[in-house]
Amino acid sequence: VTAPAVALVERFTGRKVAATRSLSGGCVGKVLLVSLADGGRVVAKLGPGLEPEGWMLRYLARHSRLPLPHLVHGDDHILLMDYVEAGDSLTPAAEAHAAEVLALLHAHSWHSFGLDRDTVIGGLPQINTPNARWLDFFRDNRLLAMAEQARAAGRLPAVTMARIETLAGRLGNWLMEPAQPALLHGDAWTGNLLVRGDKVAAFIDPAIYYGHPEIELAFGTMFGTFNEPFFRRYEEISPLAPGFWEERRDLYLLYPLLVHTRLFGGSYLAGIDRIVDRFLG
């Protein structure tokens, strides 16, 4: 892998490569830290299947002030990004900073829920067919679409799929339409936040679309990424409507739980069953 990657890095940067080493990657591609002969460093992510990620990074750079790695070059086979000096833990101050920049991101709006193209999450197709109603978009393009991906892959039992379909028909009992569609990172958890000191230096691996900010906030609680310091600061900027913690958070967690079930199977099914049982009885 490395020799062709070196040639691509030298071609697209116009600089000589001195050394490479592997970094822990995501669900798509191999990731290399490339040291250049002039002392610079870039990160190379090797595909195929990388075009959507490059497109999303460019979209966020154009439409938001979210901290991002600068994209030097992007196509379906390679993404080249400036190396972001990071690696610190998410402190309370860094959580508060994450809340500030995500609240700013969520202030960017569009005429519909969805996007004018499909994107990916963890390498899986993420359907973004625009819809004027959030409840319909979440039901069809998030909950049912990802449940079907998991079922087709043999990771979601038919009985669970049937219960999710029943729940999908009743979402209006609990979910609310937001004031407007909000631009979402879509995959904001600890592994996709590069922290330096008391700030998030960059958000990586986006899965963007316009949706309800609450789905982003719910996912942020799934692995304990966002805690009291985050939510205190976020609500100073954009207060949450009553009922998020009591009801809506669990319903929105079904989407990332289904993504993880499709990718990894196993233990995530129990979380899905717990939530479905709670709302269907």
Residues covered by each model-derived region:
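An alpha-helical support segment within catalytic cores of ATP-dependent transferases
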Residues: 2-10, 110-183, 236, 278
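Conserved N-terminal boundary motif of the eukaryotic protein kinase catalytic domain
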Residues: 13-21
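ATP-binding pocket architecture of kinase catalytic cores
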Residues: 21-136
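Hydrophobic packing residues in well-ordered alpha-helices of helical domains and bundles
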Residues: 95-98, 160, 164, 272
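Active-site Asp-x-Gly
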Residues: 134-139, 148, 180-183, 190-247, ...
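Hydrophobic alpha-helical segments that form the core
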Residues: 250-258
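ATP/Mg2+ or Mg2+-diphosphate-binding catalytic cores
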Residues: 259-281
